């Protein structure tokens, strides 16, 4: 699957209020509700789970991720969110 370049500010604004996965340069992933994005593209996530090497390591609640640590951000499809809710 090919990736298409997207302007980051509208992309992040469209993801605000939805569940996202943020991967850091260091390999950790955070899955949570994107509460807000500032002008520097720092990310505030709520109800956040931390994953290291694909394994859930803990629930962190509300976190702030500084922009320069982010490798990528992706939205979580709604059907994937529903599957996760069913597992709980």
Curated annotation (Swiss-Prot):
PROSITE patterns with a match to the protein in the record: SM
Subcellular location: Nucleus
Keywords (A to Z) from UniProt: mRNA processing, mRNA splicing, Nucleus, Ribonucleoprotein, RNA-binding, Spliceosome
This protein's GO CC annotations: Sm-like protein family complex; spliceosomal complex
GO biological process, one term: mRNA splicing, via spliceosome
A Pfam family this chain is assigned to: LSM
Positions of the Sm domain: 7-79
Alphabetical list of SMART domains matching this protein: Sm (SM00651)
Domain of life: Eukaryota
Major place of residence: nucleus
Listed GO MF terms: RNA binding
Entry similarity comment: Belongs to the snRNP Sm proteins family. SmF/LSm6 subfamily.
Purpose of the protein: Probable common Sm protein, is found in U1 and U2 snRNPs and may be part of the spliceosome.
Protein name per Swiss-Prot or TrEMBL: Probable small nuclear ribonucleoprotein F
């Amino acid at each position: 699957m090919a990736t298409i370049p997207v302007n980051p500010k509208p992309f992040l604004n469209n993801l605000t209020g939805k569940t996202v996965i943020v991967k850091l340069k260091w390999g950790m992933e955070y899955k949570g509700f994107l509460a807000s994005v500032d002008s520097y593209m720092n990310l505030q996530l709520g109800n956040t789970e931390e994953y290291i090497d694909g394994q859930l390591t803990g629930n962190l609640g509300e976190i702030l991720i500084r922009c320069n640590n982010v490798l990528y951000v992706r939205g979580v499809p709604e059907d994937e969110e529903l599957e996760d809710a069913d597992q709980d």
